[in-house]
């Protein structure tokens, strides 16, 4: 097969994958790229979450963990009710919600992995101050999972990696030479700044 024919096939395949992977984000209806199967990402997130639970020290503050779980359950119910009322498919169907409180006073953070795996660090509790503040932080993190931002980001990463490999092939390996000469993934770095994290 000649080079031109090969590039046509690759180009058509990439366009097909991109078009097939386009969908709309829940609530905002914003177009987003989703070429990574959500179930795969959820399974990977669940495995990583288990490792985090083994590695990190969990807080023994049962009252605070119960508060986190209570806030989470209320949000789960609100999300479900919203999508039922709106007659929209619930993007959290299939989520296996779980909540942990990690004992790290220096870490002022919380996050929600794909599939509803949520962690709150004890350090952020000084900032949130009360149930309302904690609910605001948790709501923000859960919104990322509802909007499927991780799936979109992983899909962009795959597409970017494929494009970078294609550019390297077309340039006769020049991109790899630049990376070796500079000791860094030049395109990866530039794309991280300009494409993956534009704001």
Residue ranges and their predicted role:
Residues 2-199:
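A Zn2+-metalloprotease active-site environment signal
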